[in-house]
Amino acid sequence: MVLNKALVLVDVQNVYYTCRQAYKRNFNYNRFWRELSYNLDIAHAFAYAIDKGDNKQREFQNILRAIGFDVKLKPFIQRADGSAKGDWDVGITLDALEHAGDVDEVILVSGDGDFDILVNALKGKGKTVTVYGVPGLTAESIQKVASKYVPIDTTLLL
């Protein structure tokens, strides 16, 4: 059986905070990878995270690498007014568009509605786009435009 080639894009911060908010639990990256790789040939897999420089985060990032993710880090920026910045929306979008030509499917793990434009663009290129997100915390706009929406439920949690 020939498996479809897939690009996997994980917005680590979004997944962490939505899983914690909804379930007070963490996402199970190992189970997620097993489920995907059973049905898909994972051509590229990126996990986008913020680097705060602490050891616990480095250990987690190394676990992601061991699973098979290419971990992309952006420094955590604390502004003078106390607010913080550290999102990967542009980086995820650029990687999605760069690698879409190599794959049949794109798997996006994020509930961020800003990605609805990206999902539409990928579908316009003939790609199947599956979005994983936490129910109630995933923007309706991205659920509507996705080829398929997969709710992150307790089966995908630690």
Q: What residues fall within each predicted segment?
A:
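Domain-level signal for Mg2+-assisted phosphodiester chemistry and nucleotide/NA-binding surfaces
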Residues: 1-88, 128
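Nuclease catalytic cores that cleave nucleic-acid phosphodiester bonds
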Residues: 53-158
